[in-house]
């Protein structure tokens, strides 16, 4: 039995890549051979440093992703697209029994329609280099059609009811909610009982314009004026093309004269992230409309009180008193979070157990078994593994 995992690149090391890694582990542990189709060769050391686990032994083959390919690779029993929010990957023989699409949020068709420059560049990296404008337009149309067919002709999984409603509205497809995997046990065990916390504020996000990190810098200006918090640490991974956006954020900090309040750390190691989590009392998420919010769950499991915008999937698990719509409300929510008792932190931490990697793997394996029948005997014979 062979399963083909499809993902643009695992080297971005964000929440979507964590899900792809857990999915690879879930399928491999069932005794099914796993092949990876991707545009960029995985940097196994970077992946290990980011997630504390290796997938090298789980992959039987790594092939170059070809979104023009019309049919599945020979002998492939099931295709799992773990990048279904961005990647229009469709084969003519796809159906709901041999194709699974994990769609964090159905954004690709919108990005194609509006001609988003970043997404257009991503499509060009896939197949458009050297094409004439007329051929590029034909390919954009083909990509749009492929995305729609992929969503309609596969079993679609998503991360929250917020995303489920968006998928139903856009494609008429009723997807199944499978929350993404989060290393809640690692963060809880390493950080929950920390006695070294101060009034510092933590932000975890990939440095990319789509993440709207400038929102937390605008909030930081008001927090500093109101003498709330000792510092704000903004940390996350950054690819080479993120330098321009990072410079913009740096200039914004200087414009607000927040150099002594806002600090950036890029591509930090996992142990450094744990150090910051042990010190922080409040986590702020910058993006309204976040489909789920893996970093929010990580922070909660570590005993950090989350403060999030009041639109998005994170509203399904963050208490209303820690949600905000305006920056003024954000200041009030941060003040409430800073004053939260230890019992509140423990309660929120333990509420995240349902999002554990173990639960994700178990539920994904059950879905795979139910729709394909390829793993029943293997699943019964092998225990659920942990990353």
Predicted segments with their positions:
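A conserved mid-protein helix/loop that constitutes part of the nucleotide-sugar donor-binding site
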Residues: 18-22, 199, 208-222, 244-245
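A charged, aromatic-enriched C-terminal amphipathic alpha-helix characteristic of glycosyltransferases
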Residues: 63-66, 342-387
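Membrane-proximal helix-turn-helix segments that form the acceptor-binding/catalytic region
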Residues: 119-156, 163-165
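Nucleotide-activated donor-binding/catalytic signature segment of Leloir-type glycosyltransferases, i.e.
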Residues: 246-268
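Short alpha-helical donor nucleotide-sugar binding micro-motif in glycosyltransferases
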Residues: 267, 275-280, 364
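Aromatic "clamp/platform" in nucleotide-sugar-dependent glycosyltransferases that forms part
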Residues: 288
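Short hydrophobic beta-strand element within catalytic cores of glycosyltransferases
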Residues: 296, 305-308
